[in-house]
Amino acid sequence: MAHQFDVVDSEIVLEAPIIAVRRDQVRMPGGNVSAREIVEHFGAVAVVAADEDNRLYLLNQWRQAAGQRLVELPAGLLDVADEDPLEAAKRELVEEAGLEAESWSLLTDMFSSP
């Protein structure tokens, strides 16, 4: 049996250029109401770029949230109006790595942490 979670109230508690935070009041299966904070985000793309020897191209970038430089895939926000995710991935690969790919395949479409 699937549980029902009804939103009984919702408010935006933070609006910023690339995120918003929404607080929903959710009626749980037992009847209690509980607050749930949801980060609303444009979404993002990441590119696994491999050369002819199957070596991956990685970047070393400062990430303020981590307080350090991280090794990561070329990636970026879906922040251009009406831009297809594949076009965003192509744009980010050029912007961040100076590369253009010969072929493209979708590996996954997912929530990183809903």
Report the location of each language-model feature:
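A short, amphipathic edge element
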Residues: 1-11
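Conserved Nudix-box catalytic region and its N-terminal flanking loop in Nudix hydrolases
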Residues: 2, 36-91, 95
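Hydrophobic residues on conserved beta-strands that form the core of alpha/beta folds
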Residues: 7, 21-23, 35, 59, ...
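Acidic, metal-coordinating catalytic segment for phosphate/diphosphate chemistry
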Residues: 9-46, 52
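Active-site segment of metal-dependent pyrophosphate-handling enzymes
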Residues: 20, 42-43, 63, 72, ...
